[in-house]
Regions:
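C-terminal structural segment of proteins
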Residues: 1-223
């Protein structure tokens, strides 16, 4: 899972798994279905397929279209990205930002419970992500500042508003703890769903600081 992370790791000999299993041939994990209120995407569906499907909400489709390059988008899958939970991956922010349900081989897991830190999830040993169900929002948008070489998010923010007015804001690429919900922004946007209502940048404490940007810089980009 997470080939955009896994392949560079293998090339650098930072990881040496004894076995690699290809899940792309499992037909039950390869479809996209919609019932109007939600859309379910199989774990083996590629980023390209998500990007080009008319059943996928526009914000999620646009997110998928901005992942990696064409080679990555035609091979990489939503299930692999979600299971890998790279701290700079885009899909985790959509899962949290839309209140998705992760379908695993061991059962269903709410996105709020699934992502537990950098490269850490609620998946049990030997479990895989078989699909993800996303509620269809009334409004949503995803914006990211891109690391030019990898196309990962230096910082990415997914914002949604449901038909009942409920707002979720999720941030990827910024925190040492991985993807997180920005509750201050959620509370502000719940009262006034406009750019003017977005609060000042979150605290830089706990933000990633590396060669791509300091913690303070990432906090600034979030807002």
């Amino acid at each position: 899972s997470g080939g955009q992370t896994l392949i560079p790791t293998l090339k650098a000999r930072l990881g040496m798994p004894t076995s690699l299993v290809d899940l792309s041939g499992i037909a039950e994990m390869s479809g996209i279905t919609s019932n109007g209120d939600s859309v379910t995407i199989g774990g083996a569906v590629t980023h390209h397929a998500v990007n080009t499907s008319s059943d996928v909400p526009p914000a999620l489709a646009a997110l998928a279209g901005g992942i990696g390059d064409p080679a990555v988008r035609h091979r990489g899958t939503i299930g692999g990205s979600v299971a890998n939970n790279d701290p700079s991956a885009c899909y985790p922010s959509a899962c949290l930002g839309l209140g998705a349900t992760i379908h695993a081989s061991g059962g269903d897991i709410a996105a709020d419970d699934f992502f537990q830190g950098m490269f850490d999830t609620a998946l049990g040993e030997g479990q895989i992500v078989t699909g993800v169900t996303f509620p269809v929002p009334a409004k949503a948008n995803y914006q990211k500042f891109v690391q030019p070489a990898s196309r990962f998010a230096l910082v990415g923010v997914f914002v949604s508003q449901m038909a009942d007015g409920y707002v979720r804001v999720a941030v990827t690429g910024a925190s040492e703890s991985g993807v997180f919900r920005w509750t201050d922004a959620e509370n502000a946007l719940a009262s006034d769903f406009s750019a003017d209502a977005v609060p000042a940048a979150p605290r830089a404490d706990g933000m990633i600081s590396d060669l791509h940007g300091s913690a303070a810089y990432r906090a600034h980009l979030v807002a």
